[in-house]
Amino acid sequence: MTKHLTTLAAGFALSAAALQAQLPQSRVLTLDLAQQIAQETLAKCTADGFKVTVLVVDSMSAAKVMLRADGTSPSTAKVAEMKAYSTMMYNRPSGPAQPLPPGQTAPPATIPGTINAQGGVPIKVGDVTIGAVAVSGAPGGDKDAACANFALAKLADKLK
């Protein structure tokens, strides 16, 4: 009886290991990392003289962190949300200057909740998008995007 139980237990252990090997592995955007990205992005824009809102979302487009600089227009929060959603929807930086993904025929502005404005940048671990950082409030989306890209470059070692 003991021999059968030992064999059965070994079989379960092997089955569990095989099942685990088949499960997809994924990275999750932690709150700590989201806060660091938001803070670095806001610090860069502030140093450049811009009052902005920074929004960091996870892979499901759910807000993790939002920071609004003092004196920032309330509308920047909604625009940042739309930039983040656009980034996650198309898995690329937001903005009209970006080419559409292969097979995509509709420009991003035709999808409700998206916007044709730069400032949304994917947060990637390798080729996997784990979230997005979106910025609104600088005088031009290129400046919004530059702040986000600066923060992601600064924190690149944490995105491995």
Regions found by a protein language model. Give the residues of each.
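Positively charged n-region of N-terminal signal peptides that target proteins for export
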Residues: 1-5
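Flexible, solvent-exposed loop/hinge segments and secondary-structure transition points
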Residues: 20-160
